[in-house]
């Protein structure tokens, strides 16, 4: 039987379809991908190649919960739910259910002079999370960075528990994060056990200084905010300063120096993850969003480079 000249399913890169964005001819490139609806490349980011899978959560959307859920178990509306243990070493379910899903492009760069794109994914009900959500990720390239808008709409007929995050790795141009200066303006940090699960909370004055050999995998709360409601994390190198900002929908920030990553990625970039809720929120209920039928949650964050 003869084969068609044009394949029914043309080959696609492991990272999915590529959406190349740029704010004008001289703007820095921003690349969103259909695998997980995340970011592969962008100003101020330590990204990954088109032919790679995103390791360490790199650039991925984390929903309907971020970070770890203890034993993958939680109760909602009087019903016990069990999710697959996606991180067996810690007996936790980590970073949600949409990281490896194929997202659909609903608005491409051709309609925005190359500046923006919108991807969406319908999360279907499944064992452990029997709710239906419409997730939308919108990316806009700027002359000095980019903006991300993430939203979730409850398509089910019952209230749905929800949390979100995103997992960019920042780079200030240093070979290792050790040589960068870091400022996190926060009033508390969670204490955790050896599984990375919360055991308590303590007051801090954030973090301000050279990263050096510090091993960070910390969840910061009580975030200081400017008059615009934004919290910021600043990473400074000799050649550039990278600022990640997050609006009030993001109540927590996870900062991770990447010490557990593969050697070629270890401490090359600093993960700064905007989180709507802390780890284990599906079980604890802390800062968990309750989406009523038809209700939409929206959070915005972005990066500027100077």
Question: What positions do the PLM features span?
Answer:
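Beta-strand-rich N-terminal accessory domains
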Residues: 1-83, 87, 229-249, 295-305
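Acidic, contiguous internal or C-terminal segments within carbohydrate-active enzymes
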Residues: 10-14, 121-173
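Acidic/His-leaning functional-site neighborhoods
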Residues: 17, 92-106, 213-284
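Active-site/ligand-binding surface loops and adjacent short beta/alpha elements
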Residues: 56, 159-161, 168-249
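Short alpha-helix capping/helix-loop boundary micro-motifs
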Residues: 66-68, 282-286
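A short, structured loop/turn motif at beta-sheet edges
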Residues: 75-79, 106-117, 140-145, 174-178, ...
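Extended, loop-rich substrate-binding clefts of extracytoplasmic carbohydrate-active enzymes
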Residues: 84-143
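Beta-strand-rich interaction surfaces with strong enrichment in secreted/lumenal proteins
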Residues: 136-138, 286-291
């Amino acid at each position: 039987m003869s084969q068609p000249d044009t394949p029914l399913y043309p080959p696609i890169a492991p990272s999915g379809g590529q959406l190349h964005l740029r704010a004008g001819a001289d703007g820095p490139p921003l690349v969103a991908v259909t695998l997980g609806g995340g970011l592969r490349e962008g100003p101020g980011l330590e990204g990954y190649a088109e032919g790679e899978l995103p390791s360490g959560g790199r650039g991925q959307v984390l929903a309907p919960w971020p970070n770890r859920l203890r034993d993958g178990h939680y109760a909602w509306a009087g019903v016990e739910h069990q999710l697959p243990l996606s991180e067996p070493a810690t007996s936790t379910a980590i970073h949600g259910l949409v990281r490896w899903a194929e997202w659909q492009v609903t608005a491409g760069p051709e309609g925005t002079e190359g500046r923006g794109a919108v991807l969406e994914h319908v999360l279907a009900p499944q064992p452990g999370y029997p709710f239906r959500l419409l997730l939308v990720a919108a990316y806009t390239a700027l002359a000095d960075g980019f903006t991300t808008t993430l939203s979730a709409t409850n398509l089910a007929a019952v209230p749905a528990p929800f949390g979100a995050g995103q997992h960019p790795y920042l780079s200030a141009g240093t070979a290792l994060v050790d040589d960068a200066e870091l400022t996190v303006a926060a009033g508390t940090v969670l204490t955790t056990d050896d599984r990375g699960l919360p055991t308590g909370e303590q007051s801090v004055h954030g973090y301000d200084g050279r990263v050096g050999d510090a091993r960070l995998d910390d969840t910061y709360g009580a975030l200081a905010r400017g008059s615009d409601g934004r919290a910021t994390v600043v990473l400074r190198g000799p050649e550039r300063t990278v600022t990640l900002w997050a609006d009030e929908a993001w109540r927590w920030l996870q900062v991770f120096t990447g010490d557990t990553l593969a050697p070629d990625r270890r401490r090359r970039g600093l993960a700064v993850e905007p989180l709507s809720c802390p780890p284990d929120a599906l079980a604890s209920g802390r800062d968990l969003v309750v989406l009523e039928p038809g209700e939409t949650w929206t959070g915005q964050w972005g990066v500027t480079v100077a």
